[in-house]
Amino acid sequence: MRSVLYSYILFLSCIIINGRDIAPHAPSNGKCKDNEYRSRNLCCLSCPPGTYASRLCDSKTNTQCTPCGSDTFTSHNNHLQACLSCNGRCDSNQVETRSCNTTHNRICECSPGYYCLLKGASGCRTCISKTKCGIGYGVSGYTSTGDVICSPCGPGTYSHTVSSTDKCEPVVTSNTFNYIDVEINLYPVNDTSCTRTTTTGLSESISTSELTITMNHKDCDPVFRAEYFSVLNNVATSGFFTGENRYQNTSKICTLNFEIKCNNKDSSSKQLTKTKNDTIMPHSETVTLVGDCLSSVDIYILYSNTNTQDYENDTISYHMGNVLDVNSHMPASCDIHKLITNSQNPTHL
């Protein structure tokens, strides 16, 4: 008896699931219920989410519902005659935030670093890489589609990264620098033409037929961008300087090693001693002279924080022989520039 009753209950359950327990009926006050749809002036049961109408109702039999198959879905009460196909797999620049199942479509959203250019009913259809703000610029906001807005860093702020997320940071007001100015004055020098060679991230050099000035730099965050060289009355003034967009990380020591080499057969060398060494910032220097073609050398190295009120500075100097007067010089760039790319330590010039 119990087995017969259990079978009967199971049979009734199947009928209810398939919508066959209630025959279609006429609308009440011209309306059907929320879980019904209207067909030929009859109110028929809708299929629940996750199923579709494998057989529509007629005057005697209600809707027959069948579960959705793999990669298909219905998310609302319906009388669709087939389930909807889920969206395809997410692109490489997207992440799946909801997987496809019988009641929900797959949803893909943009990965970090991307924004949605074209939205769909279920997530984003097209993701585009966000704009990256360059050195000296920071993220100041976002467009209506989610792309980055870049703005120049104002007074008292800086940025030394290329990023789609970093904002301009407040300047550290002491014990660091964002600008390096190197001045090298030499006597006697005759050749007025020069070649500048840059090995990115490693060294700068100015060479003439008489001598070569090489500056090797290590762990320096400000980027050297330009040089100058001029000769007047056998006195040469030359140098290198950086941009102002990048601050020195105080956990590192910016090291500058200079070699001034005469292009003759004399290979003797000597180290110059600092004559001024006002140091509160993270830097270190050496100067080596190779050869005997010069009788006077002046070197001035200025490390500056250009965003402080009076320019906080460290000044380093080296001297040999007479102090040279270069006030009448008109510095100019070298005639030839050569760039050697160092793939292990790339730096934007």
From Swiss-Prot:
Q: Does the keyword Membrane apply?
A: no
InterPro entries for the chain: Poxvirus_TNF-rcpt-II_C (IPR010806), Poxvirus_TNF_rcpt-II (IPR011172), TNF_chemokine_rcpt-like (IPR051670), TNFR/NGFR_Cys_rich_reg (IPR001368), TNFRSF_N_viral (IPR034059)
Start and stop residues of the TNFR-Cys repeats:
31-65, 67-108
**Which residues carry attached sugars according to the database record?**
N101, N190, N249, N277, N313
Q: What's the short name of a Pfam family annotated to this entry?
A: TNFR_c6
Signal peptide boundaries: 1-19
Matching entries from PROSITE patterns are given as:
TNFR_NGFR_1, TNFR_NGFR_2
- GO terms for cellular component: extracellular region
Q: What induces it?
A: Expressed in the early phase of the viral replicative cycle.
Q: Which CDD domains match?
A: TNFRSF_viral
Listed GO biological process terms: positive regulation of membrane protein ectodomain proteolysis; regulation of T cell proliferation; symbiont-mediated perturbation of host defense response
Q: Which molecular-function annotation in GO is an example for this chain?
A: tumor necrosis factor binding
Where in the cell is the protein located? Answer: Secreted
Which Cys pairs does UniProt list as disulfide-bonded? C32-C43, C44-C57, C47-C65, C68-C83, C86-C100, C90-C108
Q: Which keywords fit this entry according to its UniProt record?
A: Disulfide bond, Glycoprotein, Repeat, Secreted, Signal
Q: Classify the source by domain of life.
A: Viruses
Q: What is its main location?
A: secreted
Its biological purpose: Inhibits host immune defense by binding to host TNF and various chemokines in the extracellular space. Binds host CC chemokines (beta chemokines) and CXC chemokines (alpha chemokines).
Q: Name the protein family.
A: Belongs to the orthopoxvirus OPG002 family.
Protein name in UniProt:
Soluble TNF receptor II
Q: Which organism is it from?
A: Monkeypox virus
